């Protein structure tokens, strides 16, 4: 899936320490040829390949993943690894289909630190263990499929929990609405949870449809056009804001214990062959995957977080993974975020006077005659995310997102349908027709 190193997945939490009893690396499938294991893998997961060349490549991928599995097992005595449904994929294929892309999260932290409200947490009394699944705030595990939409599943899972904890019924909400409609993110090519919250606030008054009325269909990597059929779509929840949570695990635990599941980003490179137990040596090189933090347990020998993934219930511990607390394992403490739901809100009933308007964003646009944004310049202030009629039957809109500004013109006065769009870096000079342009976003 598709920008900083900050935060881009059920069974009851129990204190299970698998200790050194887990099979050491050399003991995993010892004595069984890789070709025989591959044949068993194909039968188990119904794999059939079109050509001999593809079969040979898939076998090579499988053998490489066996090596990686044994390496992970050797470093993680409290976890168990094994052959999973991903084993015929190359590392590059796995990353492209199931991870978000480091570039997105690398820019996100810088942008978020500058522009988003930070939440405070009471660190004085953090419970020893919390599991929001036991309290009814978590929907069943879902499956993103071969689509880099983890960001949408992370954001939606967080909203589901926040909606429930604001006093409403737990309802499964639509990831497809974000994947197909959210033009601040990139569908199956990746995205960010904070941008998803922003898009909802700026384009739907914070409303998110139910999964039943707008089901997920992008598991094969195809993203259909956005559906706006008001007769078929049902609003399931509404958010009125979002927050950044302190990037320390103690602050995260305190906030989660009081407020519910947290959308986080992490490095999921160690997850391909994970089966069960607690990861204690998780790769932490770059953020590449969005997940949902639903609980933790500090009562046993190895304290751990409980994380809801979006790879289906046949992965990990019925769709979940446990990761050691206290050492920023998998970089999980670097991008913790949450939507906010007003307790009095009810789906489809709020008015503009009841829900605070999104924070205004102004764009300072400088258009110049030269190529360096220095000569013959004209400066204009434009309100972002608002349709501006141009007087000739058309209109334009300008939008801000991390590190870029998008300008679109439309042949209608409502800024709907396909527009002609042009992107520039935020706050940097760029070529523009025979001269240059610089768009700078100001968050008021």
From Swiss-Prot:
Glycan attachment points: 228, 372
Propeptide, chain numbering: 20-124
EC number: 3.4.22.-
Enzyme class: hydrolase
Cysteine pairs bridged by disulfides in the record: 147-188
Locations listed in the record: Lysosome
Keyword field contains Transferase: no
Any one GO molecular function term: cysteine-type endopeptidase activity
Keywords: Disulfide bond, Glycoprotein, Hydrolase, Lysosome, Protease, Signal, Thiol protease, Virulence, Zymogen
Cross-referenced SUPFAM superfamilies: Cysteine proteinases
A GO biological-process term: proteolysis
Signal peptide from the UniProt entry: 1-19
Active site: 150, 289, 309
Main location: other
GO cellular component: lysosome
Pfam name, any one: DUF3586
Name of this chain's protein: Cysteine proteinase 2
């Amino acid at each position: 899936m598709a920008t900083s190193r900050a935060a881009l997945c059920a069974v009851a939490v129990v204190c299970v320490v698998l200790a050194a009893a887990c099979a050491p690396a050399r003991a995993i499938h010892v004595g069984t040829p890789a070709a025989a294991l591959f044949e068993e893998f194909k039968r188990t997961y119904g794999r059939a390949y079109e050509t001999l060349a593809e079969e040979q490549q898939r076998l090579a991928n499988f053998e490489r993943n066996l090596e990686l599995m044994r390496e992970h097992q050797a470093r993680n005595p409290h976890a168990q690894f094994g052959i999973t449904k991903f084993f015929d994929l190359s590392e590059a294929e796995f990353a492209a289909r199931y991870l978000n892309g480091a570039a997105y999260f690398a820019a996100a932290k810088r942008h978020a630190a500058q522009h988003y409200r930070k939440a405070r947490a009471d660190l004085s009394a953090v419970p020893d263990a919390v599991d929001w699944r036991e309290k009814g705030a978590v929907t069943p595990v879902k499956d993103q499929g071969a689509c880099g939409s983890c960001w949408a599943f992370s954001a939606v899972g967080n909203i589901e929990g926040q909606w429930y904890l604001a006093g409403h019924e737990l309802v499964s909400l639509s990831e497809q609405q974000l994947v197909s409609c959210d033009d601040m993110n990139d569908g199956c090519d990746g995205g960010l949870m904070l941008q998803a919250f922003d898009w909802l606030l700026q384009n739907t008054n914070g409303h998110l449809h139910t999964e039943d009325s707008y089901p997920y269909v992008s598991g094969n990597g195809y993203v259909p056009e956005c559906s706006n059929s008001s007769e078929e779509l049902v609003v399931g929840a509404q958010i009125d804001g979002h927050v950044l949570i302190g990037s320390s695990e103690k602050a995260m635990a305190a906030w989660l214990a009081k407020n519910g599941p947290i959308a986080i980003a992490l490095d999921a490179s160690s997850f391909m062959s994970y089966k069960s137990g607690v990861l204690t040596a998780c790769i932490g090189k770059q953020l590449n995957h969005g997940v949902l933090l639903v609980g933790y347990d500090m009562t046993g020998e190895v304290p751990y977080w409980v994380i809801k993934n979006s790879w289906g219930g046949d992965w990990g511990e019925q769709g979940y993974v446990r990761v050691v607390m206290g050492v920023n394992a998998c970089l999980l403490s670097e991008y913790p975020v949450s939507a906010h739901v007003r307790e009095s809100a009810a789906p489809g009933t709020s008015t503009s006077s009841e829900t605070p308007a999104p924070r205004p964003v102004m764009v300072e646009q400088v258009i110049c005659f030269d190529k360096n944004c220095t000569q013959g310049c004209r400066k204009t202030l434009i309100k972002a995310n608002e349709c501006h009629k141009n007087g000739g039957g058309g209109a334009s809109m300008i939008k801000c997102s991390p590190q870029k500004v998008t300008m679109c013109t439309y042949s209608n006065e409502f800024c709907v349908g396909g527009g002609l769009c042009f992107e520039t870096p935020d706050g940097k000079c760029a070529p523009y027709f025979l001269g240059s342009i610089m768009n700078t976003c100001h968050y008021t």
